């Protein structure tokens, strides 16, 4: 899995006509974020495919998972308060990104959303160790749901992360996929793909 850093641009000429229309329908601050994120995505993908940003067949309306045209691979997008992550693969892929120091009610999340096996493994932990372990599993679960093109509301309770954190299984669909965690600066990220070979082929772009 290869990783690169790229900063968002500001030149709206790199956007598609459809993206310009979508941006015009958003509040000003959200429109700026939308334009910059789509320009950045196009820049990352153009660099990967060796084409211009305008040639990238990207469909990424506000609030919806981004898609590439058939034959261009699969992508997944995640963002937190101060960073964005884009993943590309020849096979379906999902990513999730969070600040490594994010504070949240770890005990409550485990009790409400995690499987019985996960609760048994985690609820004896306390403090910072519990927070880190829950964050890692939450990242993998969200990445897996994006890989699935599912939803948190419908699928979160079905995804169980392995003790080694190297795979996740959907209990309702009887599907098992590969996962990988990484640290990058102030952030923690997870990638979910069909199998371990797809992990090797995956490309990441962080901004």
Predicted regions and their residues:
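Core catalytic alpha/beta fold that binds nucleotide/phospho-ligands
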Residues: 1-207
């Amino acid at each position: 899995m290869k990783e690169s850093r790229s900063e968002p641009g500001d030149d709206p000429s790199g956007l598609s006509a459809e993206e310009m229309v979508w941006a015009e329908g958003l509040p000003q601050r959200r429109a700026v974020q939308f334009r910059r994120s789509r320009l950045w995505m196009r820049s990352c993908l153009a660099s990967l495919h060796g084409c211009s940003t305008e040639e990238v067949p990207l469909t990424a309306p506000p609030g919806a998972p981004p898609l590439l045209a058939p034959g261009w691979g699969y992508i997944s997008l995640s963002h937190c308060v101060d960073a964005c992550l884009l993943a590309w693969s020849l096979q379906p892929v999902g990513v999730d990104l969070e600040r490594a120091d994010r504070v949240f009610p770890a005990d409550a999340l485990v009790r409400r959303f995690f499987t019985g096996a996960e609760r048994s493994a985690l609820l004896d932990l306390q403090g910072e160790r519990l927070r880190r372990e829950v964050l890692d599993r939450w990242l993998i679960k969200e990445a897996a749901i994006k890989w699935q093109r599912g939803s948190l509301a419908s699928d979160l309770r079905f995804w169980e992360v392995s003790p080694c954190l190297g795979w996740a299984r959907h209990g309702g669909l009887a599907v098992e996929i590969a996962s990988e965690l990484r640290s990058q600066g102030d952030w923690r990220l997870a990638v979910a793909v069909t199998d371990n070979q797809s992990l090797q082929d995956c490309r990441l772009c962080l901004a």
